[in-house]
Amino acid sequence: MTKLSKRQQQILEFIKQEVKTKGYPPSVREIGEAVGLASSSTVHGHLARLESKGYIRRDPTKPRAIEILDSDLTKEREKEEVISVPMIGKVTAGQPITAVENIEDYFPLPKRLAAGEKQLFMLEVMGDSMIEAGILDGDYVIVRQQSSANNGDIVVAMTEENEATVKRFFKEKDHIRLQPENVHLEPIIVRDCTILGKVIGVYRLIN
């Protein structure tokens, strides 16, 4: 491959680092901020030269579609370990959350994002009751299976009406308050509930 200028090397290393740590490439603006270039056209020019020299491949129809043509990085990403996290389609009272009949699919979650947890499941969020916690309608919450919770934890709970809900948990004097993170909604007050797990992460597709 053709030798790179110092600036091109900086840009390439930044892209590699972002892909390695986040799993996707940076935007043109992020590249410019990282290497001290205020002009997006200048960044585009460097990216074009990196592409012509065989270091990257770009898709002009997509803003972040930068592929690193680097065998070492490719091999490292290919060998990255993943765990198969069950994606729960429904929650049935009296059954384990990961009962076979509840599982719709499996999601390949990189181990480095699982934070050492093994007993995980994912559940699609429906509605806007947790928007102020950054959990939106259509998101998938990543949940660690556990049967207890501390006040303030965001949990998946089964209510007395056998409905699963994602709310913030508070055990109070003679009841449990399942608090939405939406100022327009009222809390759910129950005498008891079953904790299915604690939310530890969120997965979202960006359209």
UniProtKB/Swiss-Prot annotation:
InterPro entries: ArsR-like_HTH (IPR011991), LexA (IPR006200), LexA-like (IPR039418), LexA/Signal_pep-like_sf (IPR036286), LexA_DNA-bd_dom (IPR006199), LexA_repressor (IPR050077), Peptidase_S24_LexA (IPR006197), Peptidase_S24_S26A/B/C (IPR015927). Belongs to the peptidase S24 family. The keyword Repressor applies. Its EC number is 3.4.21.88. This is LexA repressor. The active site is at S129 (for autocatalytic cleavage activity), K167 (for autocatalytic cleavage activity). It catalyses: Hydrolysis of Ala-|-Gly bond in repressor LexA.
